[in-house]
């Protein structure tokens, strides 16, 4: 599955980067966040030790993190030069990569998600919350 998702994404990004309607992928990302940054929920107030853990690509979410002042991002990765997907951060990969980067004994105080597929991360957290729209429900 990872191979298929990676190849599909690579093909899409390669075509997008060659499009005459797009100045650059980076500009497309900037334009996207100029338009949608305001949709980040107001309840989220970044802290210095926050980690954004997502299956989305560093290419896109990295810009949101920069604007939010969040320095810690664990995301799927794309080599911008080749548009090849180098890492997919989903399912059990999230917990594995998180532990690789932050250590096996790091404590997660609070974990927020919109997906039950994040159960491995929920299990690692002291407190966990499911987010749906503007509703936040504690699940652990």
Segments from the language model and where they lie:
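C-terminal cap/substrate-recognition subdomain and adjoining C-terminal extension
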Residues: 28-140
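A metal-dependent, Asp-based hydrolase signature
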Residues: 1-40
């Amino acid at each position: 599955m990872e191979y298929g998702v990676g190849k599909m994404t690579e093909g899409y990004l390669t075509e997008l980067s060659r499009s005459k309607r797009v100045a650059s992928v980076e500009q497309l990302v900037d334009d996207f966040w100029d338009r949608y940054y305001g949709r980040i929920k107001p309840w989220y107030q970044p802290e210095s030790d926050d980690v954004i853990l997502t299956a989305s690509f560093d290419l896109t979410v990295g810009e949101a993190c920069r604007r939010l002042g969040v320095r810690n991002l664990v995301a799927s990765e794309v080599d911008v030069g080749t548009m090849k997907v180098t890492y997919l951060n989903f399912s059990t990969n999230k917990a594995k990569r998180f532990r690789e980067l932050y250590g096996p004994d790091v404590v997660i105080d609070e974990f927020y998600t919109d997906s039950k597929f994040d159960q491995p991360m929920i299990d690692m957290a002291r407190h966990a919350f499911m987010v749906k729209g503007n509703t936040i429900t504690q699940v652990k």
